[in-house]
């Protein structure tokens, strides 16, 4: 198999004959997910720079200790760093990629809501300064609709 601007590549012939099934809902990926563990490939395929910042001093982190990229419609459109405290999902940092599109803030907010539900939390809290005004407004909108609370 040849791909323009790539070195040698291999693909399972069966995988090339079946149409890919997109994941129906946006999903946060953990930093060790097979899709993103090889950073140069992620940069090449998604134009997404992912750095695992857990070993950096807190003052040098850009996105957070254990940041999770957000996969939506086959693109990495944002990222968030989460913590769990006293029955709440705390968003310590949330941001969108420049190419994310006009609905990305709402998608990120709904994805935070889904994650909170999956892990059994009934509250979402937003750390002070964790997100820009667009993302913060989207989180407030989603949380109000679902009776979850966002605390600045």
Language model segments and positions:
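Long, charged, low-complexity, helical-prone intrinsically disordered regions
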Residues: 1-152
């Amino acid at each position: 198999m040849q791909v323009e601007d790539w070195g040698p590549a291999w693909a399972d012939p069966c995988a090339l004959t079946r149409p890919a099934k997109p994941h129906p809902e946006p999903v946060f990926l953990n930093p060790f997910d097979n899709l993103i563990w090889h950073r140069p490939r992620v940069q090449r395929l998604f134009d997404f720079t992912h750095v695992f910042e857990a070993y950096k001093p807190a003052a040098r982190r850009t996105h957070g200790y254990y940041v999770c990229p957000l996969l939506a419609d086959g693109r990495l459109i944002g990222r968030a760093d989460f913590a769990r405290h006293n029955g709440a999902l705390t968003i310590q940092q949330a941001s969108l990629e420049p190419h994310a599109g006009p609905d990305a803030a709402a998608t990120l907010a709904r994805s935070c809501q889904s994650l909170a539900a999956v892990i059994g939390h009934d509250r979402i809290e937003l750390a002070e300064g964790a997100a820009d005004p667009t993302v913060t407004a989207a989180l407030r909108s989603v949380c109000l609709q679902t009776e979850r609370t966002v605390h600045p």
